[in-house]
Amino acid sequence: WFGGGTAIVLANGEFRESLDIDFLVSDQQSYRQLRQIVRDHGLGGLTTRELVLGRPPTVDGYGIRSSVLVAGTAIKFEIIHEGRIDLDNPSPGTEICGVRTLTRTDQVASKLLANDDRWADTSTFIRDLIDLAMMKPDAVALKAGARKAVDVYGTSIGTSPAV
């Protein structure tokens, strides 16, 4: 599913400079299939258009990472094997450019987990919290996403100094 800050911003009808595109998959069989396609055919095996690669993909148990060149600019491309939480299937109609986005609950959970991992890294400029604020989740999605994140990381969710 299309996730990360870029998906959040686009889903809210906003725009910002983004130098990365993130996709998340939690289903083991689906990730195995994606890995095999990329190993056999490169990233081109996943797309309907030819890509200009900035670097060849690296594939491991955590994800598939590469960069693609768009108008001469390298854009980081990641398919993250999200093994911490089970991602819910997004509803039809939640697509951006034909790709379904994470559910609001999973957007909240993934951003809370990312913030907990990166809060001390000043180079991130607390972007995960900014993304959460941009998405303006309703109370149901916020509570459900927080519950998913707390189930994984415990009470450190919501208590990091940057929160």
Task: Please annotate each region the language model reported.
Residues 1-163:
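Compositionally biased terminal segments of proteins
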